[in-house]
Swiss-Prot record:
Pathway: Lipid metabolism; fatty acid beta-oxidation. This is Fatty acid oxidation complex subunit alpha. Substrate binds at residues 296, 500, 660. NCBIfam families: FadB (TIGR02437), PRK11730.1 (NF008727). The keyword Iron-sulfur does not apply. Heterotetramer of two alpha chains (FadB) and two beta chains (FadA). The active site is at 450 (for 3-hydroxyacyl-coa dehydrogenase activity). Involved in the aerobic and anaerobic degradation of long-chain fatty acids via beta-oxidation cycle. Catalyzes the formation of 3-oxoacyl-CoA from enoyl-CoA via L-3-hydroxyacyl-CoA. It can also use D-3-hydroxyacyl-CoA and cis-3-enoyl-CoA as substrate.
Length: 729
């Protein structure tokens, strides 16, 4: 053994070839600060070996390196800019030393080589991979850019266009594409990876392969003519401006950095990468996006822990076909859990099967599946008008009309046709689960399972624990949701549960703004362009359905009369009474016409102004800041109340439910992250300016207490140790 660290070791393999093996404690390798330092120490040893002929990098895990240790990011990002810059210089000196070894180097990559893992293997001369490879640089999705030389080496290896596509989008790619664009040199079966790697190294050692020529372009300026450079970077900047927009600065900065560094050799190019990375790491966007990643890991880890002793359902059923039922059936079947889809109406069953078939055909068109796979999946969805086969069902989700009487009757009838251990769930969006459970003989086997539309796209499923829901029931439904590829978040029961309970105060803030003379078009524009929602409130109401919102508004008002009961006729009432139901019938706040692809496209409709004039004061202008405050304060207050009342268990779960269920702008990180970034004291000052607008604007007592001491909701993060300590960690 030449060197042994906590996460890697160095040893002779054979005849002058050394192997550097990543083998961290636990299930995966991460390129954390300690591993970077350890890699430097291994190179200290390696550089002294006079009989060294070649170096092989490999992993003892199922994946090569999954990336940097993102749990370190928030504390690293608090290190002063100069110190963070110094540490990056140190880290890059390690990768440069790896790249500058006077012998050929090869990475034998199995599974993932992402982020720092990808940057590490770019520093070697050759990359041999297994077919399950995923390689890429996802840093821009975290609000930063590559910092270990990825923005320097990748463009010089692949050319600007291919590298920009991966780096700006934060993409990872598979083995076939990586080989095609020249990111890897060969693909071999896992059992042949080591022998294949040694064979390539031997060819490089004996001169059959020119490893020095392979290395040289990475040390030089990017080979691009002025015209090529102008075209590549102009197109890339245009694409990034269109897709990322102003709220996500990292992709544009990455493109501009690669452009600026193109005319320099490695050292100066790395300095430019460093100068761009460090300010990005100190942005609120980076903290928010890293926070989302960590929250996602926390939520998924919680679901995994909850289901560790539970068998995943093998047979499911959906009650109620149509778009929602068809969407749930498709998702279950697509992920490998056969499903019976029951309805009392033949037409609905046809609609449900058509929805599932449509989604599968889209996968076929995109080349993700073949006809055989399509037929296999669709054959596991069984439409039926009766309860045949329900004795084999492990879990049933009800997705019938949003009416408590109908839901209770359907659930009670189903309970009589399933096994005593079968779990029942309701896809209700607002009706309290404990109320629906009153119709059942086995309420302990019942809970809520709230999917979001469209089911195949929306990652969140709210799992609602009723008063009598058992732990086993919750665990089974969480297991099914996880198997479906969804992110399940368990919440306690109340009208609207978590997501709709916090959404309707936001809509109420919108209604009050319109009542006071705001133009809904400006409100939509401000909430989309300035705050960053994917849709403004008027557009969102049209998509949800004005009739659906009108009904849900009444349910929420009955559940929370003190805050959500209104004493005036609002814009939603006016549109509902005029049968303007939104996208579903082409008229809402906006008018909708189908585009060439058959998708609804919104247009202005002057007719809506006269309807809204009946429920509004004369038009007046509101500043962007006032619109954002009046829209967001009711929502944030309600989110805080849900945490205080135990409806949601943690700020992390609340923020993920908002991002995954409502499209809360990820660069804000969720309501609690936004609140922490703003500061609770500053938020209280802002909210108090609007408390005259009513109970929705009254700040909860717990938040007032936080504001007195300006305390955050997330645990405070300590800055990483000084850079000198980081080097030798």
């Amino acid at each position: 053994m030449l060197y042994k660290g906590d996460t890697l070791y160095l040893d002779w393999l054979e005849d002058g070839i050394a192997e550097l093996v990543f083998d961290a404690p636990g299930s995966v390798n991460k390129l954390d600060t300690a591993t970077v330092a350890s890699l430097g120490q291994a190179l200290d040893v390696l550089e002294k070996q006079t009989d060294l002929k070649g170096l092989l990098l490999r992993s003892n895990k199922a994946a090569f390196i999954v990336g940097a240790d993102i749990t370190e990011f928030l504390s690293l990002f608090l290190v002063p800019e100069e110190q963070l810059s110094q540490w990056l210089h140190f880290a890059n000196s390690v990768f440069n030393r790896l790249e500058d070894l006077p012998v050929p180097t090869l990475s034998a990559i199995n599974g993932y080589a992402l982020g720092g893992g990808c940057e590490c293997v770019l520093a070697t001369d050759y990359r041999l991979v297994t077919p399950d490879l995923r390689i890429g640089l996802p840093e821009t999705k975290l609000g930063i850019m590559p910092g270990f030389g990825g923005s320097v080496r990748m463009p010089r290896m692949l050319g600007a266009d291919s590298a920009l596509e991966i780096i700006a989008a934060g993409k990872d790619i598979g083995a076939e594409q990586a080989l095609k664009i020249g990111l890897v040199d060969g693909v071999v079966k896992p059992e042949k990876l080591l022998d294949g790697a040694i064979a390539v190294l031997r060819q490089a050692i004996d001169g059959s392969l020119d490893w020095k020529a392979k290395r040289q372009p990475k040390l030089e300026p990017l080979k691009l003519s002025k015209i090529e450079a102008a075209m590549s970077f102009t197109i890339a900047k245009g694409m990034v401006a269109q897709t990322a927009g102003k709220h996500y600065p990292a992709p544009m900065i990455a493109v501009k950095t690669i452009e600026a560094a193109a005319r320099f050799g490695r050292e100066e190019a790395l300095n430019l990468e460093n100068k761009s990375f460090v300010p990005l790491a100190h942005t609120n966007e980076a903290r928010a996006l890293v926070g989302i990643f960590l929250n996602d890991q926390f939520v998924k880890g919680k679901a995994k822990k909850l289901t560790k002793d539970v068998e995943t359902p093998k047979q499911a059923a959906v009650l109620g076909a149509g778009i929602m039922g068809g969407g749930i059936a498709y998702q279950s079947a697509w992920k490998g859990v056969p499903v019976i889809m029951k309805d009392i109406n033949d037409k609905s069953l046809t609609l449900g099967m058509t929805e599932a078939a449509k989604l599968l055909n889209k996968q076929l068109e995109r080349g993700r599946i073949d006809g055989l796979k399509l037929a296999g999946v669709i054959s596991t969805i069984h439409p039926t008008l009766n309860y045949a086969g329900f004795d084999r069902v492990d879990v049933v989700v009800e997705a019938v009309v949003e009416n408590p009487k109908v839901k209770k009757a359907v659930l009670a009838e189903t309970e009589d046709n399933v096994r005593p251990d079968t779990v029942l769930a309701s896809n209700t969006s607002t009706i309290p689960i404990s109320e629906l459970a009153s119709a059942l003989k086995r309420p302990e086997n019942f809970c809520g399972m709230h999917f979001f539309n469209p089911v195949h796209r929306m990652p969140l499923v709210e799992i609602i624990r009723g008063e009598k829901s058992s732990d086993e029931t919750i665990a089974k439904v969480v297991a099914w949701a996880s198997k479906m590829g969804k992110t399940p978040i368990v919440v306690n029961d109340c009208p609207g549960f978590f997501v709709n309970r916090v959404l309707f105060p936001y809509f109420a803030g919108f209604s009050q703004l319109l009542r006071d003379g705001a133009d809904f078009r400006k409100v939509d524009k401000v909430m989309e362009k300035q705050f960053g929602w994917p849709m403004g409130p008027a557009y969102l109401l049209d998509v949800v359905g004005i009739d659906t919102a009108h009904h849900a508004q009444a349910v929420m008002a009955a559940g929370f009369p003190q805050r959500m009961q209104k004493d005036y006729r609002d814009a939603i009432d006016a549109l509902f009474d005029a049968s303007r139901y939104g996208q579903k019938n082409g008229l809402g706040f906006w008018r909708y016409k189908e585009d060439s692809k058959g998708k609804p496209k919104k247009e202005e409709d002057a007719a809506v102004d006269s309807l809204l004039a009946e429920v509004s004061q004369p038009k007046r202008d509101f500043s962007d800041e006032e619109i954002i405050a009046r829209m967001m304060i009711p929502m944030v207050n309600e989110v805080v109340r849900c945490l205080e009342e135990g409806i949601i268990a943690s700020p992390a779960e609340a923020d993920m439910a908002l991002v995954y269920g409502l499209g809360f702008p990820p660069f804000h990180g969720g309501a609690f992250r936004w609140l922490d970034t703003l500061g609770s004291a500053k938020y209280l000052d802002m909210a108090q300016q609007y408390q005259h607008l009513g109970p929705l604007y009254e700040v909860p007592e717990g938040l007032r207490n936080k504001a007195r001491h300006n305390e955050p909701y997330y645990p405070p993060v300590e800055p990483a140790r000084p850079v000198g300590d980081l080097k030798t960690a």
